[in-house]
């Protein structure tokens, strides 16, 4: 049986408490694609790499999508009302500010295709740590990877000697 439509504005006003750090996401729909509502502020420094595109629509407030584009770090501002389609395989870190709400759509992962969560050194910009996994639950797996990094001093220490953080300082 088909699900009933969801009024996003009503859902957001009734369920803001479900949008908790470090990722602040809640999965509304699953099956073929995952549709998430994501609130701010979030608390993360990781970059997500997945092989499929991600669609961002900013419902309330602005956000910054930090990306590594052809080897260069840069910021993309997605303003309230804007939509943006991020191609697959682009490392990205969505930075969400206080009292902001966005909608994100991600395609279900093909079998055998893994996601990566990586952290770049805050000093030398080299990859300090990376985990790879088959993503079947965006609601929990990204958060679990962030919490594991947060508790692993060895993973957080770069070859250059810099100690890195899972949350912005």
Curated annotation (Swiss-Prot):
HAMAP family in alphabetical order: 3_HAO
GO molecular function terms listed in the Swiss-Prot or TrEMBL record: 3-hydroxyanthranilate 3,4-dioxygenase activity; ferrous iron binding
Role of this protein: Catalyzes the oxidative ring opening of 3-hydroxyanthranilate to 2-amino-3-carboxymuconate semialdehyde, which spontaneously cyclizes to quinolinate.
SS bond partners: none
Record field: catalytic activity: 3-hydroxyanthranilate + O2 = (2Z,4Z)-2-amino-3-carboxymuconate 6-semialdehyde
Superkingdom: Eukaryota
Pathway the protein acts in: Cofactor biosynthesis; NAD(+) biosynthesis; quinolinate from L-kynurenine: step 3/3
Family, similarity comment: Belongs to the 3-HAO family.
Name of protein: 3-hydroxyanthranilate 3,4-dioxygenase
Classification via InterPro entries: 3hydroanth_dOase (IPR010329), RmlC-like_jellyroll (IPR014710), RmlC_Cupin_sf (IPR011051)
Record lineage: Eukaryota, Fungi, Dikarya, Ascomycota, Saccharomycotina
Residues annotated as binding Fe cation: 48, 54, 92
Coarse class of the protein's main subcellular location: cytoplasm
Localization (cell): Cytoplasm
Binding site for a divalent metal cation: 121, 124, 158, 160
Binding-site list for substrate: 54, 96, 106
Keywords, ordered alphabetically: Cytoplasm, Dioxygenase, Iron, Metal-binding, Oxidoreductase, Pyridine nucleotide biosynthesis
One Pfam family named in its UniProt record: 3-HAO
GO terms under cellular component: cytoplasm
Entry binding sites for O2: 44
Any one GO biological process: anthranilate metabolic process
């Amino acid at each position: 049986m088909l699900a009933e439509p969801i009024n996003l504005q009503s859902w957001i006003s009734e369920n803001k408490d479900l949008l908790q750090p470090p990722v602040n996401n809640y999965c509304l729909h699953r099956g073929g694609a995952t549709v998430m509502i994501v609130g701010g502020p979030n608390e993360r420094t990781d970059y997500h790499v997945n092989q499929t595109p991600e669609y961002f629509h900013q419902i309330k407030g602005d956000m910054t999508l930090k990306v590594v584009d052809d080897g260069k770090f840069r910021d993309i501002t997605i303003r309230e009302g804007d939509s943006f389609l991020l191609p697959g395989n682009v490392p990205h870190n969505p930075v969400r500010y206080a009292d902001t709400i966005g909608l994100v759509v991600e395609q279900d992962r093909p079998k055998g295709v893994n996601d990566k969560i990586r952290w770049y050194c805050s000093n030398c910009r080299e990859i300090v740590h990376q985990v790879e996994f088959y993503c079947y639950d965006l609601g929990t797996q990204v958060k679990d990877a962030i919490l594991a990094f947060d508790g692993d001093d060895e993973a957080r220490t770069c070859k250059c000697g810099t100690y890195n953080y899972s949350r912005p300082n």
